[in-house]
């Protein structure tokens, strides 16, 4: 079985980001990503720090904004950042405080700066096959499959999870690669048998070790998007110990989808800066 090392793939993408950041700098442009952090959630803070640290290594300027208080104040912060011509990309960390929805927040992010595909218009453009930034986690799934040379065209793909951040957008991205996609969720009947027919399984539910060996046909590729912190550390949707004896390829947790997601946010920021 191949373990699909997201860290090494992220490093490859990072070399491209460094080169492009240097070209922009030579033209007098500093690619800048604004991270809006309206929550005191420790995991969100931790991830914001990872983004900031990674950005610094590849030549992208990262600025953290920590608005607190009423939803209106948070939206005002997003509007201020959106109007700043020196900012090229914007992401808003979740969970959001009460009184704010992802849709409302996304509508305040201009699509040209929406490097994590949070604006509903970005998802709509994705569905229509128009240029847009896809949510970075969903894009990371396709990036990993592409770099691992796992064929998507004609492949049967089972996506477990139908959320707007991963399940729906990754299904659209896979359809664009000519895959045959089945979306499964909590109401799906016969989930195990459906998954077992797939050449590729993408699981994004947040339910630890949901996907066992019985889900996986021999040789299938399994992309584990789930991340849950337990007393023993991070675990994913996939029971890696069981699945590794059956799958042909598997992303680890941690070290799989996560590092690629972070680097794609920075690559998107570069692309947004280039288009500005």
UniProtKB/Swiss-Prot annotation:
It catalyses: (6R)-5,10-methylene-5,6,7,8-tetrahydrofolate + NADP(+) = (6R)-5,10-methenyltetrahydrofolate + NADPH; (6R)-5,10-methenyltetrahydrofolate + H2O = (6R)-10-formyltetrahydrofolate + H(+). Pfam families: THF_DHG_CYH, THF_DHG_CYH_C. CDD domains: NAD_bind_m-THF_DH_Cyclohyd. It comes from the Bacteria. Pathway: One-carbon metabolism; tetrahydrofolate interconversion. GO terms for biological process: L-histidine biosynthetic process; methionine biosynthetic process; purine nucleotide biosynthetic process; tetrahydrofolate interconversion. Belongs to the tetrahydrofolate dehydrogenase/cyclohydrolase family. Catalyzes the oxidation of 5,10-methylenetetrahydrofolate to 5,10-methenyltetrahydrofolate and then the hydrolysis of 5,10-methenyltetrahydrofolate to 10-formyltetrahydrofolate. This is Bifunctional protein FolD 1. It comes from Frankia casuarinae (strain DSM 45818 / CECT 9043 / HFP020203 / CcI3).
């Amino acid at each position: 079985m191949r373990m699909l090392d997201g860290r090494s793939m992220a490093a490859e993408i990072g070399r491209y980001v460094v080169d492009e950041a240097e070209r922009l700098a030579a033209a007098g442009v500093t690619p800048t990503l604004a991270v809006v952090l309206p929550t005191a959630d420790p995991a969100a803070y931790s991830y914001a720090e990872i983004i900031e640290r990674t950005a610094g290594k590849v030549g992208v300027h990262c600025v953290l904004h920590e608005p607190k208080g009423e939803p209106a104040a948070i939206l005002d912060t997003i509007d201020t950042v959106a109007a700043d011509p020196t900012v090229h990309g914007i992401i808003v960390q979740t969970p959001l405080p009460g009184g704010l929805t992802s849709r409302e927040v996304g509508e305040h992010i201009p699509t040209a700066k929406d490097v994590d595909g949070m604006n509903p218009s970005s998802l709509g453009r994705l569905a229509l096959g128009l240029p847009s930034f896809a949510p970075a986690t969903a894009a990371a799934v396709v990036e990993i499959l592409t770099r691992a040379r796992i064929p998507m065209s004609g492949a049967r793909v089972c996506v477990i999870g139908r959320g707007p951040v991963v399940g729906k957008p990754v299904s659209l991205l896979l359809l664009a690669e000519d895959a045959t996609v089945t979306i499964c969720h909590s109401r799906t009947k016969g989930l195990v048998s459906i998954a077992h027919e797939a050449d590729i399984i993408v699981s994004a539910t947040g339910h630890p070790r949901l996907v066992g060996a019985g889900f996986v046909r021999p040789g299938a590729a399994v992309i584990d998007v789930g991340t849950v912190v337990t007393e023993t550390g991070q675990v994913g949707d996939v029971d890696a110990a069981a699945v590794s004896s059956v799958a042909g390829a598997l992303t680890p947790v941690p070290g799989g989808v996560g590092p690629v997601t972070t680097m794609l946010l920075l690559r998107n920021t570069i692309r947004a800066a280039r288009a500005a």
